[in-house]
Amino acid sequence: MTENKISSASDTITMYCTQPDLVWDIVDKDGVNYVKQAYITKKYQDTAWVFDTAYKFFRQEAVKIIPKPQEAESPIWMYRDKKWAVPNAGCRRMHLEIPKDELILFDRRTWNKILNMEYVGTDEEIAAFEQEYKRQGVRDPLDIMKSSFYPLLAQKIKKSWQHLFTDPLPEETYWQGAVWYLKKDWVVEEE
């Protein structure tokens, strides 16, 4: 597995993260915060299976890059470009300086494809996969992941998700990052 690392003189990378006020209050009070999987299931309800599937893949691969603390059940997402970290009501955006050895970087566009349960690859690979599933009578590719009728196709989709960790990093505006926890020491300022 190729790690998406960058080189620079600094030991940290500037990132932006939006979280509910409660999370930042915990970080401020306790110095650290970890995400619980139950929060994700509660937040997404009917579509939780999509997030469970994508997050499970991410966790399984991310621990190969940065070991996961026992307290962490899910990663925390952040962005290099603050325009992607838009706070909703009851949330705050923080400017963070994350140590490079704590941060996994990847292309946010690829991650969005994974969250949509899509096949990831070159245009040619995607076209070939589309032909394959259409030959098998699949009209909506989401059905591949929703049902248990297409295990080989689902396996191919999940295998294609490796691109998240093996493709070179794109231009910085598309960098997304993940950490296993948020630390008070990383907060530079509230935006």
Task: List each model region and its residues.
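Conserved NAD+-utilizing ADP-ribose enzyme module
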Residues: K5-I13, Q19-W49, A72-S74, W84-R93, ...
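Short, well-structured hydrophobic secondary-structure segments
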Residues: V50-K83
